[in-house]
Amino acid sequence: MQYKILASDYDNTLMPFGEAKPRPAVVKAVKKLQAAGGKFVLSTGRSYPGIRDKNQLGGIRYDYAITCNGACVVDRQGNVIAEHPLTSEEMYVLVDFCEDYNYPLQFNFRDAYYAYCEYEYLHTGYQMMNSPGLDCVDGEDQDRHLVDMPHAAFAAMPPQEVERFHEKYGYLGLHWMQTGAQNADGYCYYDIVRGGMDKGVGLADLCAQMGLTLADAVAVGDSANDVGMLKVAGLSACMANGTPDAKAAVDRIIGDVREDGVAALIEELWFDGPRAEPSGKDFGSAWGNIESAGGSL
């Protein structure tokens, strides 16, 4: 088989957002891939603390993980093998902006998500979403970065406020990526990393460490923060539930996350199974847990 690794997004790609773990067909397919010598790479906007609970993956043990949208790549044990943390200036500017307008802001550190602004909003939202691995600690003392710098940030605000940020601080070149859908109170959610950073950079870092090329990789995702890796992988696929920008970046569309699209792709590419294609069924939005929330995540 020409491909050596499968890099899969987590939420609404490997498993439906809000469910406790990947569905059995996906778990079986990933384990079969690994038994045949393929490497499974979890690629996510989450930091390592958001994916380290083995139970949340239904028995899947990833070989590597591209975390924080490419800003930190780790091995199975969580050891960092490549990283691109935020600078002090980038972090302080985000804090100043979100404090001025009372927007929720968290930073993704090695050990946990720390909410530097509007902790209660973030914590309550995570509890409502009930997505395994997602929660934050109260970081409003704003001192965790004195130990080491975060790899990424996460903020909630109306979309027009992102433009206001860029008007004031565009010189920093921070990369904002919307994740999920707009919720009932008009807020959108954004993963934020250094300029030029995305999952494609993380995938390139990992391939270099493994002695592989990007042509050896298959990448699959569903939303804006996946576009970087979808564009650089040897073969790319977007879930049928994916966003228009993700669909525009890929070689092909596969089945919805709720019909085990990743499992079908593995069977096709590694085991000569039928071509993985969407069924055409309308499953509705895969982000219902966010869209129905108001005043919280």
Residue ranges and their predicted role:
Residues 34-35, 99, 170, 231, ...:
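Anion (oxyanion) recognition and catalysis
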Residues 1-5, 23, 193-297:
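Mg2+-dependent phosphoryl-transfer enzymes with acidic/Ser/Thr/Gly-rich catalytic loops
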Residues 37-41, 62-63, 151-153, 215-216, ...:
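Short active-site oxyanion
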